[in-house]
């Protein structure tokens, strides 16, 4: 891995495609409830980053594939780290909705 690869942002469109192709996967939006209401990716579940560690069981199966996004990719990166610390083993940061050009729900 070269130095600049470390700073490369995830591609949210690739992440959404992977989510759609993965049976049983959960698409997790870690933005605030207000941000979520303003527009979110269809099928996503909202658990704000600030509440993530208070969730007893986001999913009973800690191996379930979780695809995590936020606005820019920063909170989702933090959420992935926290979820891994909580024992979730199949977690992926897919970036931020700011770069998303697909359909959103309100």
Placement of each model-derived feature along the sequence:
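Rhodanese-like catalytic fold shared by cysteine-dependent sulfurtransferases
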Residues: 1-18, 22-25, 33-64, 74-106
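N-terminal glycine-rich beta->alpha transition that marks the start or flank
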Residues: 29
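Short, surface-exposed ligand- or partner-binding patches at beta-edge/loop junctions that are enriched
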Residues: 69
